[in-house]
Amino acid sequence: MDTRAFDAGVILSALPQLLEFLDITLLVGISSIVLGSLLGGDLAWAKLSQHKILNYLAQLYIYIMRCTPSIVMLFIVFYGLPALVEAVFEENIHDMDRAVFAIIAFTLLFSAYVSEIFRAAYKAVPQGQYEAAISIGISPWGAFWHIMLPQTAVLALPNFGNSVINLLKEGALAYTIGLIDMIGKGNLIIAQNFGAYGIEIYLACMIIYWLMSIGIEKAFGLLEQRLDKGQLFSSKAGKKQAVFILKEGEASGAGL
């Protein structure tokens, strides 16, 4: 048991050492967010589709992932994926970078959560607007891109931002498979000091995560304001087209 007196100076001296490994933490987090969002979008589409098999498989996947603790999924991927690949393809991936295993695990988990966010946000947008756009000759893709997607993004953004922050914090578990990220480096510093300064090191980690969470929260707040003001459209013509379609939908009674 560490009986040393608390030393605030250790926090300041540890911060630069921890920040050297922040890029690994961000690599795992950002990669998982991007890949998880893409997979989550596909899952949301599958749940919204009329195809019974796709709908059932998406529901099953989401249910399993949402019921699986993050650390359990991390271990399943880290220990199970190499065994599976070796059994099926006779390839040895045991020496693969541990960041890859972490990204795979967190991608699978993140996709399940954001798929429900995307699906709920899309269903909250009046579908009559899409039908009105189609009725006046807009292509299905154009109606989705210019009408449905911007409104869906605004509705999904707050919960999506919370999920991003949660994923960033869950990523701290990656050290359990030997990944030397920010938390992994913190544990190495503690080990090098024979278990001393644990409180100070973890407080330093907490400060970094706290600042990152505040930054992400502020960034999503600004993005939400931009989307609310209709600044997602890249041109005035695109905005005018969207407004025209919305008005047509309301006039025809197909909208709200």
Residues covered by each model-derived region:
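Transmembrane alpha-helices and adjacent helix-loop boundaries
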Residues: M1-L256
